[in-house]
Amino acid sequence: MSGCEGPVGPVGPAGSQGTQGSAGPVGNDGNDGNANVTVISLKKADINWVSGSYLGRTSNVYELGAPEVNQDILDHGTVLGYCLISSDWMPLPFIWENTTGSSRQYILYNYSLEKIKLFAYQTSGVLNPGSVSEYRFMLITDNTVTSGRISSVESVQDRLNDAGVDISNYFEVCQYFGIDPN
């Protein structure tokens, strides 16, 4: 038997809500991110040293315009500096003494709002740090509330120290924050 098709009928009422399913398994913790870290790289070829002074000592000075060093970094963070000598990343400040102890070489830095300054000198005068091929600065902010008794720099450094990170080791800091060290 065959029949004719008629028009589609009206939509029926919605069904009742089904029962809640069981909870799924707990997921694994994700990797810590590096949202609070900015890395600034500075190649030797990009540095134009000028004569200046550091704490009254004649030195070579380079000032890097760095808008990334903002008020948040100054209020809640720190800037860690490193220099690449041969194939080794060394922490800043970097102090090298020759084998006889008659001369020391210094490469230092400081930072303020929107700038990072490098200083280079030696006991005998101005230093041209030609053996440094690159500088890297890690701007780290810690937005956790700190008491008025410790600075934001101490807060960041304490957090890294508590995690077993040696801040003088460039690779450990990169690994902690999930940053490609190259």
Language model region names:
Residues N36-N182:
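Extracellular or exported targeting regions of proteins
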Residues M1-D46:
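Collagen/collagen-like triple-helix sequence repeat recognition
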